[in-house]
From Swiss-Prot:
CDD domains assigned: AAK_NAGK-C
EC code: 2.7.2.8
Organism of origin: Prochlorococcus marinus (strain MIT 9301)
Similarity section: Belongs to the acetylglutamate kinase family. ArgB subfamily.
Protein name (database record): Acetylglutamate kinase
Amino acid sequence: MNDSQRVSILSEALPYIQSFSGRKIVIKYGGSVMEDDDLKNAFFRDIALLSTVGVCPIVIHGGGPEINNWLKKLEISPKFENGLRITDQKTMEIVEMVLMGRVNKQIVKGINKTGSLAVGISGLDGNLIQSRELGDGSHGLVGEVTKINPEILDPLISKGYIPIISSIGSTVEGISHNINADFVAGEIAAAISAEKLILLTDTQGILKEKDNKNSLVEKTNLKEARDLIDKKIVTEGMIPKTECCIRALAQGVKAAHIIDGRVQHSLLLEIFTNTGIGTMIVA
């Protein structure tokens, strides 16, 4: 890369940096990016850069692979139904241990090593995420969000800290639930009036043709996104991600993005370049 190209990149990013300075961006961190050391380190640096230029990133994470690893160590077979983990009490204890005690703190340490300041919390802290059991309760302690109490986030964000939130919620009676991190991210984004919701995934974004990498939907709106689901263009695991984005936009989030976390620095490419890298959905 020559000097002219470097200057061009910085010039392209400048208006986006100015536009998003002081704005909150909620990022769901998951998929392969959590397992590959190079991708993890690139993500930590990207979060640090966002914070350094004045953006307020809030990171929500799951931790499926790590949970499965610990279940295997403890000789417990993970069970899934319709893509959701069947979570009994013993499994829930492991989910809490792994998400809150290991995955969360690994992310915090990774970001802090860059010189930025991250703070790890869960949905239990400050009663941030209130929940109830999902559907008829057949998935056990799998939950859905009933209310977000974002007050605990305000002092952290205002002081320049980066909140790292594990997707555990609880009922008013104190029963913990394992909640899909995509939906937690969407609900938190809505509750804090975030500028953007960004989901890091193991796909390019929404594809019009499932196996055609050239069919990426680069930009769409709420109505078109709903149509993509109704017409079964969006299928399988992309359905809940798209629905999560739709719900967040309907509650006031300005833009939602589904991007490929397997690409290094995809976060910065989506936020700070003209073309982006994934799918952007707007109201």
